[in-house]
Amino acid sequence: MEKQSSEELSIENKSAGFSRVEKPKVAEIQLQLLPYDVLRDILSRLSIKDVVRMSTLSGEWRQQRICHPDLVFTKDTFGISTDPDPDFTKTINAIIRDTDAKRASWTAEFIFNVESVLRPLWSTSTTTTTTLDKFAVEFGLRRKHKYYIDRWVSFSIASRAKHIAFDFTFDVDCAGPGCDQYKDVFPLCKLSGPSGSCVTSLVLGYVWLKLPPSFCGITNLRKLTLKTVSISEGDLQCLLLSCALLEHINIEWCSPLSSLRIGQELCRLQYLRVRRSELEMLELHAPNLTKFEFDEDLAQIVLSDCLRLSEATFVSNMRTQEFNDYDFDDLAFTFTELALPHVQKLFLLLNLDQVCSRK
């Protein structure tokens, strides 16, 4: 074997010496020196999934207590697989038990992960170290998870989030009035008054809304979406009237509703969508309404003073049927009962392939 040259030995010794020198904690030093706004900007350029992964792996990031401006928690955020993969060799009861056990495991994993992200951001039990633009939880939570739901609602308010969503319609295994017992009674009162003054957009799914007498509205709410929400006609009317700045309302699969009459003027309302809610009668005054979407459940519609209504869209609940299967006599009766004298365009979505329009 050839002898190493003196130059090679020198390089080798230097490398060995460098390896023994403790490397400075560059990442930690940089994080401590960078301004808060710069760190926040770095996080905002990443997906929430990447931020969660980075926070898990890096203690330095956790110590900074800096949060992504949009916290959107779904099963995909944490890579939770929700495929039940049933064993069809078992009995029906055994399959149901297995599915329930898996669902409980998914939910426990989801709650643990959300708590792991939020826990470092609490400075006290009622205040946080961060401000958010959006806070969303989209998972199949139920009334038995109320402790965490209420805690996360409090966090979203304390962080002054503008856009809040608690959509629990994922993996719904029970629908209808008999399933109200599984829905969380959502603490809407926490958003009422000054505490919810930052909220401009609210999405609620698979919850039960009961307005307390002290409810005084969500001051700056402009966009409201209710999906599979249990709410009485009186509470819905009170909710809409108490949010004076509402511009966009979306109501779908809500119950038990048969009619909605609002005598007072919704002067800011521009968009209204009512679908799959068995709401037979709708009457409201919205002078600035421009777009309206509805289905055949609405047998009577009275939109008084809607002089700016430029577009109305009828979406049939039987769109999966063949076009020739429609009972056009019933459809004609539906439209003779409508009071849309000022609409400029009426779109009829009758099945998946056809859109009929009348100008």
Regions found by a protein language model. Give the residues of each.
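C-terminal per-repeat helix/turn "cap" of leucine-rich repeat
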Residues: 214-217, 236-239, 262, 282-285, ...
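Conserved "Asn-ladder"/turn position within leucine-rich repeats
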Residues: 169, 207, 229-231, 254-255, ...
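Repeat-solenoid scaffold signature
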Residues: 265-291, 297-302
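Leucine-rich repeat
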Residues: 2, 21-255, 261-263
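Extended repeat-based solenoid scaffolds, especially LRR ectodomains
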Residues: 298-359
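Terminal membrane/secretory targeting segments in land-plant proteins
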Residues: 1-24
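Short "repeat-start/strand-capping" segments in structured domains, especially the N-termini
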Residues: 219-220, 244-247, 265-270, 285-288, ...
